[in-house]
């Protein structure tokens, strides 16, 4: 068991090193897109399933509350938190629609959809992307493996941050690091501070 634990640490480190070689430009582009949207008065909607739902909520909470330093709240909504809405949509329509109907109701042109799926094949996340495109929103997709079907829905105006791994756990670990990087870049862009004083 000890050896397996050590192997998991090693694999996680190796995945992060590989990601550090290919993802920074994509993360920077996504951060700039979000910053520009926020400056225009737009917001970020985030969605995902399971651990990715947790990541979507983590991002939204960091935006609404704070990341590492005090600053004004930023508008972000995690679409996985309202159980009454989610269960009513799933019951009356389909689980595939639980995010899409919220995007059609809440999304405005210029808003950002942060769509998270380790496989890139989550049907309800893809439906949310389709809804976002119909609302003239921009998409930031966090994926893994081969990008799945989500990769095919993205245009040059969107950005995919694809983790170079086929293991769900490793992808989720890097997704969290990506989210923390996004939050830091957003804060540094909107609220520059002298880090030496912190």
Curated annotation (Swiss-Prot):
Disulphides: none
Catalytic activity, reaction form: 2 D-sedoheptulose 7-phosphate = D-glycero-alpha-D-manno-heptose 7-phosphate + D-glycero-beta-D-manno-heptose 7-phosphate
Enzyme class: isomerase
Location within or outside the cell: Cytoplasm
CDD domains reported for this sequence: SIS_GmhA
Binding site for substrate: 49-51, 62, 91-92, 117-119, 122, 172
InterPro entries documented for this protein: GmhA/DiaA, Phosphoheptose_Isoase, SIS_dom, SIS_dom_sf, SIS_GmhA/DiaA_subfam
Cofactor comment text: Binds 1 zinc ion per subunit.
Binding site for Zn(2+): 58, 62, 172, 180
Classification via HAMAP family: GmhA
Note: The reaction produces a racemic mixture of D-glycero-alpha-D-manno-heptose 7-phosphate and D-glycero-beta-D-manno-heptose 7-phosphate.
Primary role: Catalyzes the isomerization of sedoheptulose 7-phosphate in D-glycero-D-manno-heptose 7-phosphate.
Similarity comment: family membership: Belongs to the SIS family. GmhA subfamily.
Protein name: Phosphoheptose isomerase
Gene source species: Alteromonas mediterranea (strain DSM 17117 / CIP 110805 / LMG 28347 / Deep ecotype)
């Amino acid at each position: 068991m000890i050896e397996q634990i050590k192997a998991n640490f090693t694999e996680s480190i190796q995945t992060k090193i590989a990601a550090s070689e290919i993802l920074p430009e994509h993360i920077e582009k996504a951060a700039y897109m979000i910053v520009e949207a926020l400056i225009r008065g737009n917001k970020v909607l985030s969605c995902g399933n399971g651990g990715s739902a947790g990541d979507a909520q983590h991002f939204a909470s960091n935006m609404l509350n704070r990341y590492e330093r005090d600053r004004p709240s930023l508008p972000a909504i995690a679409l996985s938190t309202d159980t009454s809405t989610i269960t009513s949509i799933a019951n009356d329509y389909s689980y595939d629609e639980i995010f899409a109907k919220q995007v059609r109701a809440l999304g405005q042109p210029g808003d950002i959809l942060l769509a998270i799926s380790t496989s890139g094949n989550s049907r309800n996340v893809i439906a949310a992307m389709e809804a976002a495109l119909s609302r003239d929103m921009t998409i930031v997709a966090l994926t893994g493996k081969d990008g799945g079907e989500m990769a095919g829905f993205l245009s040059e105006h969107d950005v995919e941050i694809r983790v170079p791994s086929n293991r769900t756990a490793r992808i989720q670990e890097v997704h969290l690091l990506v989210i923390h990087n996004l939050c830091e870049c957003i804060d540094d862009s909107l609220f520059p501070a002298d880090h030496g004083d912190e």
